């Protein structure tokens, strides 16, 4: 939440378009060749559909679902916005130029047991107010699996449905400790109940999704697959407690292993659930599962693709988020870039 979406950090890229031409796109360049033709098709389309796009613009800033057509800027930035998250469906991206942020050498993570979901929103707001760098959440299932297969790696709390890992960073170690101390004193919980992680060793182990997948593999002896179609959900921070309640109510009816995690500072939530790929109704079960999860998200006017910039990651379910008019615009954008459906 501190740094926004990946789209905001891209300064330029090199892309191979449908004709095989390679073009470098940055702010200020003048499109030429095939890229000029694409721009001449895209710009009038977006101008014509301004009303429809404004009406369907995601309410949540970090929602990356679909081609990013919401930016009102004029020029090459429009093309960059569309390419980021297109997952190779508009052009083949061969290089990317990112903006970077200075590395802050010192970090400290405060581990907070959340006894009640109703408290999550207030804890998140306190952490954001005290300039935390990141806020990661994991549930009791994640914690128990981690403790079982990697004892002492993750902080363990008894009878705690959710844990928040709030990370602060700074260039100066002394100032970092002062910031963390001030933050902890603002929390509505006794300090002795909190735990601290110095540095990034533990976080670098547990934050990658591969860590959770490995826990599932060990628990199920690789007889079930961790399904991640419900990764990247996003709702407002205010709605997180009731959203989690509705998710849990549904997930508990499945009788399956699941875990809820997420970079919760912006309302990002990811659900990983185990399914048997050899099951008779495997495909049907996955489809019903996705439909149920995304229906809950829709009830909260949330988004279904908040991971990185993967705008088309939930392509079969875009109709859960956008109406037919918007989906038609997406198709026209695709046709402008790749009329022969080469990509």
Cite the ranges covered by each PLM segment.
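Activity-critical C-terminal alpha-helical subdomain
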Residues: 217, 316, 321-343
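FAD-binding subdomain of flavoenzyme oxidoreductases
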Residues: 1-123, 127-129, 337-343
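Generic recognition of well-ordered alpha-helical segments
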Residues: 11-12, 89, 292, 329-332
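A short, flexible low-complexity segment enriched in Lys/Arg and Gly/Pro that occurs
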Residues: 43, 47-75, 236-245, 249, ...
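C-terminal substrate-recognition/cap domain of FAD-linked oxidoreductases
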Residues: 80-288, 294-296, 300-301, 311-314
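Short acidic-hydrophobic sequence patches enriched in Asp/Glu that either
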Residues: 5-7, 179, 285-289, 322-329
């Amino acid at each position: 939440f501190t740094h926004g979406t990946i789209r905001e950090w891209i300064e330029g890229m090199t892309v191979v378009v449908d004709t095989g031409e390679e073009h470098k796109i940055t702010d200020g360049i003048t499109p030429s060749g095939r890229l000029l033709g694409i721009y001449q098709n895209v710009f009038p389309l977006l101008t014509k559909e301004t009303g429809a796009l404004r009406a369907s613009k995601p309410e949540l800033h970090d929602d990356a679902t679909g081609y990013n057509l919401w930016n009102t800027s004029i020029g090459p930035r429009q093309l960059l916005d569309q390419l980021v998250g297109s997952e190779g469906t508009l052009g083949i991206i061969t290089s990317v130029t990112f903006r970077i942020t200075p590395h802050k050498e010192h970090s400290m993570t405060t581990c907070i047991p959340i006894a009640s979901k109703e408290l999550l929103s207030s804890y998140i707001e306190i952490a954001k107010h005290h300039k935390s760098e990141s806020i990661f959440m994991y549930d009791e299932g994640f914690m128990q699996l981690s403790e079982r297969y990697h004892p002492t790696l993750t902080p363990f709390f008894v009878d705690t449905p959710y844990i928040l890992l709030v990370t602060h960073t700074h260039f100066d170690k002394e100032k970092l400790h002062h910031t963390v101390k001030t933050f902890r004193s603002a929390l509505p919980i006794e300090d002795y109940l909190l735990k601290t992680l110095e540095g990034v060793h533990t976080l670098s182990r547990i934050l990658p999704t591969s860590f959770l997948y490995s826990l599932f593999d060990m628990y199920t002896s690789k007889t079930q697959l961790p399904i991640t179609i419900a990764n990247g959900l996003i709702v407002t921070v205010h709605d997180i407690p009731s959203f989690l309640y509705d998710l849990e109510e549904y997930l508990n009816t499945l009788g399956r292993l699941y875990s809820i995690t997420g970079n919760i500072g912006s309302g990002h939530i990811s659900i990983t659930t185990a399914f048997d790929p050899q099951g008779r109704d495997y495909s049907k079960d996955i489809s019903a599962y996705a439909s149920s999860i995304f229906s809950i998200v829709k009830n909260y006017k949330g988004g279904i693709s908040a991971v990185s910039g993967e705008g088309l990651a939930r392509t079969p379910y875009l109709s859960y988020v956008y109406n037919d008019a918007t989906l038609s615009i997406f198709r026209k954008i695709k046709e402008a870039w790749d009329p022969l459906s080469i990509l």
